[in-house]
Regions:
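Beta-strand-centric surfaces of beta-sandwich/beta-rich domains
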Residues: 5-206
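Positively charged, low-complexity/disordered segments
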Residues: 1-3
Length: 206
């Protein structure tokens, strides 16, 4: 596919003091901690608005993975977040469980829209080309949600997390998977110093 983009911009001699600047933060837990929410963003101090999330999920356990709530802790929230979702699949637009039926079986269906989607699913690592083994890998998924129409505003601080909860034939259960994410937001400067990216070996897919 080929996509053409054009960008318009304005040149100014100076910017107002209240100008918000774009920020992004990458994180990964190669094995999430059982019973502990995965942190998408933390340590955001100041005033601004949250505009998007990308999550890459390699599932390491069987059964459905998307029951964990996405939570936004805003301006001093501690035990309870201001915004608490109903499941990761709902946050990324999959209240229908991304379900598609083929040959009498239910499979996950990818999809894309301007503001949220599930564009990537694979059980094969196409980057692998080795004569001694195949390219099988744990199921890999990619999701995005852009808060263009529904930005999450904060005046003092922001933390974003997601529970690791799935469901199987015995009901809900805590999961441990390989999760990485990018959080996107605008905020007024100054901002907190964030950790540097880890070595490339620690960022490779499983």
């Amino acid at each position: 596919y080929t996509t053409l983009f054009r960008s318009d911009y304005n040149l100014y001699n100076y910017l107002p003091e209240e100008t918000e600047y774009f920020h992004a933060s990458w994180r990964r837990e190669a094995l999430t901690e059982l019973g502990k929410d995965y942190v998408i963003a933390d340590g955001i101090k100041g005033s601004g608005h949250y505009i998007g999330t990308y999550i890459a999920l390699s599932t390491l356990q069987r059964y459905w993975w998307g029951e964990g709530e996405v939570k936004f802790y805003i301006d001093g929230d501690e035990q309870y977040p201001t915004i608490c979702g109903t499941g990761m699949e709902d946050y990324f637009g999959g209240s229908w469980s991304f379900a598609k039926h083929e040959n009498g079986k239910t499979i996950e269906q990818t999809y894309t829209t301007p503001f949220l989607g599930y564009p990537y699913y694979s059980r094969h690592d196409d980057l692998v080309n080795n004569l001694y083994h195949n390219d099988d890998c744990p199921p890999m998924r990619g999701f995005y949600r852009w808060h263009v129409m529904d930005p999450v505003f904060f005046d003092e601080e922001l933390k974003v997390t997601v529970q690791q909860i799935g469901v199987g034939h015995k009901g809900l259960f805590e999961r441990q998977d390989d999760l990485s994410s990018v959080a996107y937001w605008y905020q007024k400067e100054p901002h907190n110093v964030f950790s540097k990216l880890p070595e490339k070996e620690k960022r490779w897919p499983r």
